[in-house]
Amino acid sequence: MSLTKADMAERLFEEVGLNKREAKELVELFFEEIRTALENGEPVKLSSFGNFELRDKNERPGRNPKTGEEIPISARRVVTFRPGQKLKSRVESYAGTREEQ
């Protein structure tokens, strides 16, 4: 199962008491702020969750898996996410309980 923006809005509606329109707008604005910051080259730091940052990748050689032909992979900018320590700890403890089942 994956978490969608609609799921997040529904949770805000149920648990915070926002109406559905407000909940949807809040979720959209949250992601728009992240997009805008990244578009402006700014890192996004969400306390206890993690950081989104832009990273420039240089051009590098690649290979077409079907033909084996070497082809260049162009330079590009990518978004990276580094989880915070609290998120890592929670995920690791959850993963440990699933392995025991």
UniProtKB/Swiss-Prot annotation:
Transmembrane domains' residue ranges: none
GO cellular component: cytosol
Superkingdom field: Bacteria
GO molecular function, one term: structural constituent of chromatin
Keywords: DNA recombination, DNA-binding, Transcription, Transcription regulation, Translation regulation
Gene Ontology process terms (BP): DNA recombination; positive regulation of metabolic process; regulation of DNA-templated transcription; regulation of translation
Signal peptide annotation: none
Coiled coil (residue ranges): none
InterPro entries linked to this entry: Hist_DNA-bd (IPR000119), Histone-like_DNA-bd_CS (IPR020816), IHF-like_DNA-bd_dom_sf (IPR010992), IHF_alpha (IPR005684)
NCBIfam families: himA, PRK00285.1
Complex formation: Heterodimer of an alpha and a beta chain.
Family: Belongs to the bacterial histone-like protein family.
Protein purpose: This protein is one of the two subunits of integration host factor, a specific DNA-binding protein that functions in genetic recombination as well as in transcriptional and translational control.
Name this protein carries in UniProt: Integration host factor subunit alpha
Gene name linked to the record: ihfA
